[in-house]
Swiss-Prot record:
This is Orotidine 5'-phosphate decarboxylase. The lineage of its organism: Bacteria, Pseudomonadati, Pseudomonadota, Gammaproteobacteria, Alteromonadales. It catalyses: orotidine 5'-phosphate + H(+) = UMP + CO2. The active site is at residue 62. The keyword Lyase applies. It comes from Colwellia psychrerythraea (strain 34H / ATCC BAA-681) (Vibrio psychroerythus). The keyword Transport does not apply. GO terms for biological process: 'de novo' pyrimidine nucleobase biosynthetic process; 'de novo' UMP biosynthetic process. One of its GO terms (molecular function) is orotidine-5'-phosphate decarboxylase activity. Keywords: Decarboxylase, Lyase, Pyrimidine biosynthesis. Homodimer. GO terms for cellular component: cytosol. Catalyzes the decarboxylation of orotidine 5'-monophosphate (OMP) to uridine 5'-monophosphate (UMP). InterPro entries: Aldolase_TIM (IPR013785), OMPdecase (IPR014732), OMPdecase_AS (IPR018089), OMPdecase_bac (IPR047596), OMPdeCOase_dom (IPR001754), RibuloseP-bd_barrel (IPR011060).
Length: 231
């Protein structure tokens, strides 16, 4: 079974620009991530256009609400035919468990359900401001364990956390990582980066990469080069 490891983060202001980009790459080489901005602008029909072109879609909306509402939201995502959808682990075990149970009826067609632990923008002071007396690393570990206990498929994490999380949570628990930059590319707004090969080597399962691919003159060539380093 084809299992592309690269997930291209689509960040376009215009739908046509996004679709023009997508036409330059192959679904056998990458999956696509649709976040809050593009989903708010272009809606479910945009996701259907992408899946209609043969792409697996990671719907990155980070649901966080009461359990019934989140369960209905992930059901709607499953009905859209997405490959992966996420929630905030800080919504708690009941919310995550109910969301996972809502996907039971989809069997093998259910999307992967993953959780976000601590946002990469949050530091020690931010957590303390929320009454959380843990370091970011401790809170990531706590929420990742809660995610697994709740039956979810994996977490979004930093590549720097991946090796420890994979050791603690097992090979089957998926790790999805942003902040990946091919060797030689600009860092953009990501301060701590790893190359695709480095990330895979420490246990990351799926690599979220944006501008180094979306801004490339030949994105398919860049994808092939990245894939060549991790296969």
């Amino acid at each position: 079974m084809n299992d592309p490891k690269v997930v291209v983060a689509l960040d376009f202001d215009r739908k046509q620009d996004a679709l023009s980009f997508v036409d330059k790459i192959q679904p056998t080489d990458a999956r696509l991530k649709v976040g809050k901005e593009m989903f708010t602008y272009f809606g479910p029909e945009f996701v259907k256009q992408l899946t209609g072109k043969g792409f697996d879609v990671f719907l990155d909306l980070k649901f966080h609400d009461i359990p019934n509402t989140v369960a209905k939201a992930v059901t709607a995502a499953a009905d859209l035919g997405v490959w992966m959808v996420n929630v905030h682990a800080s919504g708690g075990s009941q919310m995550m468990t109910k969301a996972k149970q809502a996907l039971d009826n989809y069997g093998n067609d259910a999307p992967l359900l993953i959780a976000v632990t601590v946002l990469t923008s949050m530091g020690q002071e931010d957590l303390h401001g929320l009454g959380i007396n843990k370091t970011p690393a401790e809170q990531v570990n706590f929420l990742a364990n809660l995610t697994k206990q709740s039956g979810l498929d994996g977490v979004v994490c930093s590549a720097w956390e991946a090796e420890q999380l994979k050791a603690d949570l097992g090979k089957e628990f998926k790790l999805i990582t942003p902040g990946i930059r091919p060797a030689g590319s600009a860092q953009d707004d990501q301060q701590r980066i790893m190359t695709p090969k480095q990330a895979i080597d420490v246990g990351v399962d799926y690599l979220v990469i944006g501008r180094p691919i979306t801004k490339a003159v030949d994105p398919q060539l860049v994808l092939q080069q990245i894939n060549g380093t991790i296969r």
